[in-house]
């Protein structure tokens, strides 16, 4: 079954995180939403395997953002995509290999508070399998992060940032 949603998206995702039993695979460009972060930490604490792919940029690594070192310490798996090579603009999540959420929704406060966003959910096996294979392909092309550090905003050299 396929369903489309245009509101209450954060709560839909939270519900699926809480219902997951085995694994969660997440590929989102940006992740700043603390409620979703806390929910995936809770999933790890329940024994759920969580794998996360994010863009390696200031939004995901700034000193005021989410502390992914806690996520790693709890046993979460993390890969960053080099934003200088490609803009990984995906926004999807697989729950236990049989439910997919995808759409325009980044896991950010802006997506929740300001943006007009949408998602679809599906349990169609062929679609979930396609996304599982795509996630595995993305993951296998990256290096898993074992240590996480934040970027201080004051350390960014504006000229270099604008040239990239």
Predicted regions and their residues:
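PLD/PLD-like phosphodiesterase catalytic module centered on the HKD motif
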Residues: 1-26, 33-164
């Amino acid at each position: 079954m396929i369903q489309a949603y245009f509101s209450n998206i954060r709560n839909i995702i939270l519900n699926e995180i809480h219902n997951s039993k085995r694994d969660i695979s997440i590929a989102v460009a940006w992740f700043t939403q603390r409620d979703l972060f806390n929910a995936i930490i809770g999933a790890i604490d329940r024994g759920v395997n969580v794998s996360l792919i994010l863009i390696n940029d200031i939004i995901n690594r700034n000193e005021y953002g989410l502390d992914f070192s806690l996520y790693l310490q709890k046993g979460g798996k993390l890969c960053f995509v080099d934003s200088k090579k490609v803009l990984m603009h995906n926004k999807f999540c697989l729950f236990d290999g049989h439910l997919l959420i995808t759409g325009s929704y980044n896991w950010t406060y802006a997506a929740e508070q300001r943006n007009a966003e949408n998602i679809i959910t599906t349990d169609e096996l062929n679609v979930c399998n396609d996304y599982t294979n795509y996630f595995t392909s993305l993951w296998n092309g990256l290096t898993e992060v074992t240590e996480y550090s934040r970027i201080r905003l004051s350390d960014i050299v504006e000229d270099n940032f604008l040239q990239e």
